[in-house]
Amino acid sequence: MTQSRHAHVALLPLLLILSSCGTAKVSEPPAKKQAESSTIDFSQPLVASALRERAIRTIEESADSVNPSIRANAIEAAGKSAQRFRPLIERGLTDPNLGVRAVAAMTIAKKKLSQSAPRCRAMLDDSAIQCRMAAIFALAANGIDVDPTPLADALMTDASLRVRAQAAFILGELGNQSSVPLLRQSLAATPASADPSQVKILHLQIAEAMIKLGDDEQRTGVRAALYPSRAEELEAAALAAQILGQVRDRKSISQMVYLSEYKDDTGRQHPAEVRLAVADSLALMDVRGGAFIVDSYAGSAEPAIRAQAAHAYGTIGDNASLNRLAGLLNDSDPMVRVAAADAVLRAIAR
């Protein structure tokens, strides 16, 4: 969800790479195999439509939340049906919370809402750099002339690593290959006082932008992050798994399956955030069999984990996943409900 890309002896059988055409299946413990049948058949158009309308109502309700994080997630989810939700997304541009404003502009950029983009010009004077960068993204992505210089300035000099990461993401999304040298230069420009684990996160996000712009050499470094050697590296491992799924890096499939199944000497696996990121990314690459990982966390006591599970169900997108999402739309936590709504719209649109 709002851009939330973070958090992770005996091994189960790791994987089966089944054919030369690139299909694979994650090994699944027999005791955890999913039932083939589900309660509701969402392949029926009317049934799927009813679930979609439930998701839409959830997004509408979430957009009115007093919690700005829920409002921001609702706006991002609204992007899955952007034309229907265009007024709701535009309303976010004037939200009192800077995060909500930024997400609204980023959604206009990513969904290329050309009718809404001119409304972002006023945000170029926003007090928050996150909003100004999002406005530049929205305008540029929709073909409106705008000075991109603040993106480069933020990438190279901003005190916040999160701001630098946002700048890198936008440069990657805009698709201008001339940004690659700047992104490469930024790898050496991080503040010396910064937390090394957070610098690693930033470098992975810069690498993702460079991969999107055609620099495939960066894939190797991202794959290397799939091998955490200490607890401080687990967040980077989860992010690396997410990035490799986004860029469809099939060479990393075996590494990701290993990451999801690894157990230390005490039999403990990596944290839920890591394993769910792997399951989500493998589903993006059509690797079957990872739903049992998601099932094991869908009932977690932690809402953030249930929300991440909902996102993964949306990526898997099969009938069993839609049945689980139908239940998560009734979750007691609003963050989980809006995550489930987002996932339903993604799954049904497939």
What are these model-predicted stretches?
Residues 17-20:
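C-terminal motif of bacterial Sec signal peptides marking the signal peptidase cleavage site
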Residues 49-64, 82-94, 113-125, 144-157, ...:
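Amphipathic alpha-helical scaffolding segments comprising HEAT/armadillo-like alpha-solenoid repeats
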Residues 2-10:
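Bacterial N-terminal signal peptides that target proteins for export
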Residues 76, 106, 137, 169, ...:
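Residue-level signature of alpha-solenoid helical repeat scaffolds
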Residues 22-25:
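Bacterial signal peptide processing site
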Residues 53, 68-69, 83, 98-99, ...:
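Alpha-helix N-cap/helix-start positions at coil->helix boundaries
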Residues 72, 87, 102-103, 133-134, ...:
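Alpha-solenoid HEAT/ARM repeat scaffold
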